[in-house]
From Swiss-Prot:
Protein encoded by which gene: DYNLT4
Region (Disordered): 1-52, 65-87
One GO process term, biological-process aspect: microtubule-based movement
Name of protein: Dynein light chain Tctex-type 4
Protein family: Belongs to the dynein light chain Tctex-type family.
Organism: Homo sapiens (Human)
Gene3D superfamilies: Tctex-1
Highest rank taxon of the organism: Eukaryota
Subunit structure: Interacts with ENG/endoglin, TGFBR2 and TGFBR3. Interacts with PPP1CC.
Keywords: Cell projection, Cilium, Cytoplasm, Cytoplasmic vesicle, Cytoskeleton, Flagellum, Nucleus, Phosphoprotein
Length: 221
């Protein structure tokens, strides 16, 4: 009786048994062999894989090493492009050093000395003189009003600082407007100590404008 021909897969198994080697798996047509199948049997260096090639690149080509280089600062930070301020100095957002803070020695007092209290009547006279000197020939202009108000506040602050006792903080505000027959009410409110703090307010008018200046003298310890 004639033997039937074996299928291709069975024929390879029989041939592998005869030769004593491991049979190769049967793959469908159009499929490539895997890494284990393509790797040669026996000892020898393993072929370079994609993962190994990526890990084997030089460290100098990585983005992390480009940021953390020889010129990096502590903690891997890149140095600033601007000038480095001295250690312990304060710097503003513009990069310029700030003015040193004003320091006053503590007196361990919670109220002023009886002879060093803020006098509202004396401040009132100085405030009237400051407004008369700064506005006697002034004409109202919307473009120059802001500059004129700043100058008046500076003049009032200089005059009253010379008359105020130590440890008093002065808060000055000036309201300026055109004189056109309108009615204006200027009101100010403050949280203060009636026994130690004070207030002076003066209004001034000429043919073109009106002004209301208010100064609060607050005892600051």
């Amino acid at each position: 009786m004639a033997s039937r021909p074996l299928p291709p897969g069975r024929q390879e198994e029989e041939n592998a048994k005869d030769s004593g080697r491991k049979p190769s798996p049967v793959r469908p047509r159009g499929c490539l062999p895997s890494i284990d199948e393509a790797r040669p049997a026996g000892p020898g260096p393993a072929p370079a894989s994609r993962r190994g090639s990526m890990l084997g690149l030089a460290a100098s080509f990585s983005r992390r090493n480009s940021l953390v280089g020889p010129g990096a600062g502590p903690g891997g930070q890149r140095p600033s492009l601007g000038p480095v301020p001295p250690l312990g100095s304060r710097v503003s957002f513009s990069g310029l050093p700030l003015a040193p803070a004003r320091w006053v020695a503590p007196s361990y007092r919670t109220e002023p000395v009886p002879g060093e209290r803020w006098e509202a009547a004396r401040a009132q006279r100085a405030l009237e003189a400051a407004l008369a000197a700064g506005l006697h020939d002034a004409c109202y202009s919307s473009d120059e009003a802001a500059r004129l108000v700043r100058e008046l506040c500076e003049q009032v602050h200089v005059r009253l600082r010379e008359l105020s006792p130590p440890r008093y903080k002065l808060v000055c505000s000036v309201v300026l407007g055109p004189r056109a027959g309108q009615g204006v009410h200027v009101v100010s409110r403050a949280l203060w100590d009636v026994a130690r703090d004070g207030l002076a307010s003066v209004s001034y008018t000429n043919t073109s404008l009106f002004a209301v200046a208010t100064v609060h003298g607050l005892y600051c310890e």
